[in-house]
C-alpha cells in the first residue's frame, strides 16, 4: 500500500479530515440523515440509464453505499476509493451484496488513481464520477 505524506504545513488538517470519516459512528450518522440519503438514493436509483454499462469512480466511498447502488443500476465496473480504513467495512458490505465482481474498493487517496492506467484507458464518455 502506498501512503501519501501531506505537506508539513497541513499535517493536522489532513489528519483531522480523514480520521473523522474513518469511524463507524460518523458513517452511521451520515447514513441516518434522511434528506442526504434520499437525495443520493434518488440521484442514483432514479437514473439507471446514467449508470448502465458505465465505469463509475466513487471518490470517498465511506460505507460504499453509492458504489453499491451504482452497481445495482447496472454499472459495468465501480471503483470505490476510500482514504480511511472504512474501506475494510465497505468491502464487507459490497461482498454481502454479492457485488465484489463489479465493485472494487481501494484504500488509497485519489491522487494514486493516476497510476491505474486501466481506468484512464476507458473513454471518458463511459465514466460516471460520484463525489458527494
Q: Which stretches of residues belong to each language-model region?
A:
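Conserved alpha-helix/loop element of class I SAM-dependent methyltransferases that forms part
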Residues: 35-54
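Conserved SAM-binding loop of SAM-dependent methyltransferases across substrates and taxa
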Residues: 63-76
